């Protein structure tokens, strides 16, 4: 048997096992009928024309540069006029990539360096701000963007802690009052196959939803070893993906995509989480490289979530939502309870399940379209709830305890320093260990 067929068989076995286990629980565990939790979107292939939209980018790393190229592809008359970052070499690389790939030149006097550089972007007569810094900074920068009455695209997640989530929610409400457009980086909501699958599930294609299963198991992403001459802050910023206070840990920074998909399809957030995790092979930073979390929903249903960033293991990025009449992978296919395909996404001129529309671009097409048609869309609340759900799972794993949604929402724990400068960072950078130690000889066997 080839590795591919062996893996396919394993996934099929896992699916059957999961469905059988959930079915044994019975109808009493049903979550609810899938309700629309997000306004239906009529996709367009390109945003309409209009007056020049002046865009400023905050965070010139790979994702920020990518988001800038994506919005330039979204429609006509879009111009990048300002850039901000704390690292000059990141700024220089971004400018070089924009010049090479999009023939974009940003004037020197509109390229700002420093922790307060985002404020200078907001003061530079932009219409739109793209926020792509490490997520620790998102709440503060989003609040300032809304206060400046600028439309905002912000990458996921919305925050790294509960105070940050509450800030995103408050700023989101203010954005609604100002009739601003806010789009988040939870891109599957802007992916055409996902959207059509969601529409069908909303209309009862799999019956009432019982449970879900999510996987984001991949290899290690990247890390940046500290170099001589770097301060604590510079070393952490350059290695931000591996530090809890900057990224939120990978269940928050990456697996939030799966978590958001399940919240979207079920139309509700969990009531509590239990879980575990650990650190087996991560090289830098202070966070885990694997999590297993079970989220419990109001009517007894569960979402079994697993994520891992370790090389040399079996990779899988998938979602499964199970209903009383079938199940779906959420992205392009619906099955009956026997595993027979009853529907698969089909786009004209494309293979089944495939789309020619890149969701990284589509989210910006939708964003610009909302701005130019004066039909504000605001995704702040849903990215905030998905972020808090991820944080809930993280803290359940860190502590080994059952943590309630309301308890997490009210948490006062804030990650990271309160002042930002290229120097020492006064935080307790220790990898979390759940439970209590086997101390005082309580577990010592004497004979």
PLM feature segments, named:
Residues 26-102, 262, 442-447:
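N-terminal Rossmann-like dinucleotide-binding module
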Residues 135, 139-190, 204:
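Beta-strand-loop-alpha-helix segment that lines the small-molecule cofactor/substrate pocket
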Residues 81, 98, 271-447:
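Glycine-enriched catalytic-core subsegment of oxygenase/oxidase enzymes
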Residues 59, 63-64, 176-184, 188-285, ...:
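Predominantly a Rossmann-like dinucleotide-binding segment in NAD(P)-dependent oxidoreductases
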Residues 102-131:
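A structured beta-alpha segment of the ubiquitous adenosine-cofactor-binding alpha/beta core
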Residues 4-25:
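N-terminal secretory signal peptides and thylakoid transit peptides that target proteins
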